[in-house]
């Protein structure tokens, strides 16, 4: 295990954000794994890792991370929305609907509301 400090963890987290923005989810995952090993309670790092798993099409791992974030922060609208997108991508639309609706209820942003409404139609 490499030596980590709060500073190196922040640098790794920020670099992982940049890699995700550059569409390099695997690179982001490599940076985030040691951060989460050192700080498993860090919800922001877990949320970023869940997004990386999603972009890497590792849907089961993404689902597990988003679920963990929701367990810790049940009012995190983005986590519900992202979990819904993950479930939708895995063709689990019935499960996705619940999380789209929760996201819209927690934060009535237009994209969340649109997704919740869209998912209600047959």
Regions found by a protein language model. Give the residues of each.
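Alpha-helical segment of the N-proximal tetratricopeptide repeat
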Residues: 6-38, 55
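Terminal, low-structured helical/coil segments at or just beyond the last alpha-helical repeat
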Residues: 2-5, 9, 97-122
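Residue-level recognition of tetratricopeptide repeat
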Residues: 17, 51, 85, 118-119
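Structural signature of tandem alpha-helical TPR/SEL1-like repeats
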Residues: 22-30, 56-68, 90-102
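Structural marker of alpha-solenoid helical repeat scaffolds
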Residues: 4, 38, 72, 89, ...
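Start-of-helix register in tetratricopeptide repeats
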Residues: 10, 44, 61, 78, ...
């Amino acid at each position: 295990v490499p030596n980590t400090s709060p500073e190196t963890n922040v640098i790794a987290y920020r670099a992982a954000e940049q890699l995700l923005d550059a569409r390099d989810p695997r690179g982001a995952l490599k940076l985030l794994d040691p951060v989460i090993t050192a700080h498993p309670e860090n919800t922001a790092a877990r949320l970023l890792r869940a997004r990386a798993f999603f972009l890497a099409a590792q849907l089961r791992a993404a689902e597990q991370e988003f679920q963990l974030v929701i367990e810790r922060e049940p009012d995190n609208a983005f986590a519900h929305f992202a979990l819904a997108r993950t479930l939708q991508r895995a063709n689990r639309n019935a499960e996705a609907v619940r999380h789209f609706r929760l996201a819209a209820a927690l934060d009535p942003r237009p994209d969340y509301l649109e997704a919740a409404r869209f998912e209600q139609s047959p």
